[in-house]
Amino acid sequence: YLYFTLPMALNYQRNSYTLWESALKTYNDNETRFVFNPKICLEKSFEEVQYALTKYKVALQKQKQTEIWLTLCNTFTELFDGNIRKLFDSLNNDVDKIRNFIQKDNKKKFPYLSETKICNYWMYVIYQYTDRKYKNIEKLTVAPDTHVCKATHKLGLITEDEFNSNNVQQIVIDRWQELFKDTKYKPIDIHTPLWLWSRNGFKEIE
């Protein structure tokens, strides 16, 4: 769970694929694997953690991103004894409760992970790559990053003015929620197709 959580907070303004390649190299190296254990991280010096995070470029901004990582380690240790599974268990695997806990009640304790785009996508990754099941998965909204917003605009679901507005992320979330309401489809399911479609330049399918 921590492997899919801590790097996610550094997943902004960078290539996601290279981030996870870096995370895997860091995990597979006995010298740097400790960064995925919050308690051990907090016992190390700042410089030791910084070195481990930058060795394979998990952290690109070595000062700021090491601070983010350590803040999260402190949060996970303080609130959940280093076991983030307890976060989901204590909130009954309820998407709304988890999101409110991170984005509203404890926003400062979850730097970047509390941001709208990253928080939704992180919960999706946990759902997709672990054994975690949410009781209301339909509440998990699309993760409105740049590519998803562009693809939503390309499909004509938002106007040019909406696409250029400061509130475009929330508009995209609301539009997909409205579209899939009372259907068998879940907004988060279309994140990857939209993201890949935009990232590849909206190529026509032959």
Which residues does each PLM region occupy?
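HhH-family (HhH-GPD) DNA N-glycosylase catalytic core used in base-excision repair
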Residues: 1-206
